[in-house]
Amino acid sequence: MKIDYLTLFPEMFDGVLNHSIMKRAQENNKLQINTVNFRDYAINKHNQVDDYPYGGGQGMVLKPEPVFNAMEDLDVTEQARVILMCPQGEPFSHQKAVELSKADHIVFICGHYEGYDERIRTHLVTDEISMGDYVLTGGELPAMTMTDAIVRLIPGVLGNEQSHQDDSFSDGLLEFPQYTRPREFKGLTVPDVLLSGNHANIDAWRHEQKLIRTYNKRPDLIEKYPLTNADKQILERYKIGLKKG
C-alpha cells in the first residue's frame, strides 16, 4: 500500500510513522509513506495557501490551487482513495478501516484552517471522514490515527494474523477481558475458567464477557449485533443478576 499525506506540517508525521508497526510495515515493503507539503505548490511569491472566504465569515479557507497542483504530481489513479479529514464526514469505524486496508493507494488531505474551498471537496475527494463530533486544529492527527487502524489490517503486517481478529469491533463486539501472570495480585485472581485448559469453555466465557461488556459500555453496538437465542439468554441472565444485586 502507498499512502500520501498532503499537509502543511509534514514533520508532525515523523514520530508516528517511524516506530512500531508502521516502521516494520515499511521495512517489510508492505507500506510506502510519502508526505507532501502543499505549500510548495502555492502559486504566488508569498507561498499563500489560504484566503478569506467569499461572502464573509470567520477564519481562513484553504485555496484550491496548492492542493490541486500537489495532487497532479502524485500520479493518482481512479482507483485511489482520496480522503478529506473533516467533521462533516462519515464517522470512522473498524468496518471503514477494513475497507480501506484493501486499497493500493490512499491520499489524505489534511487541512489546518477554517475549511476547504468546496472545489477541493467536489473534484478531488472520494471519501470524507470524521473522527467524531468534535473539531481538531488540523487533519494530521486524524490521518495518523486512521493510518494505524488501516495498516495493521494489511495481511502480513502483524506478526500474528489472529491478533486483529480478536480486537474490539472486529466482530461487532468489544474485546473480552485479558489476564496474564501472576495468577493472584493484591487479592485479585484470574477467573478459573482461563486456567482450566478447556478451550471450548474458555471460548464460551470470552464470548459471554464480550456480550456483557458491550451491553454495558456500548449498548448501541448490541442493538446492531445479530444476537442468537443463546446470546439473548446470556444477557437476560446477566440482567436478572443485576436486579438481584
From Swiss-Prot:
GO biological process, one term: tRNA N1-guanine methylation
Location(s) in or outside the cell: Cytoplasm
Pfam families found in the cross-reference section: tRNA_m1G_MT
Gene3D superfamilies: 3.40.1280.10, tRNA(m1g37)methyltransferase, domain 2
UniProt main location, coarse: cytoplasm
Function: Specifically methylates guanosine-37 in various tRNAs.
Family stated for the protein in its record: Belongs to the RNA methyltransferase TrmD family.
Protein name: tRNA (guanine-N(1)-)-methyltransferase
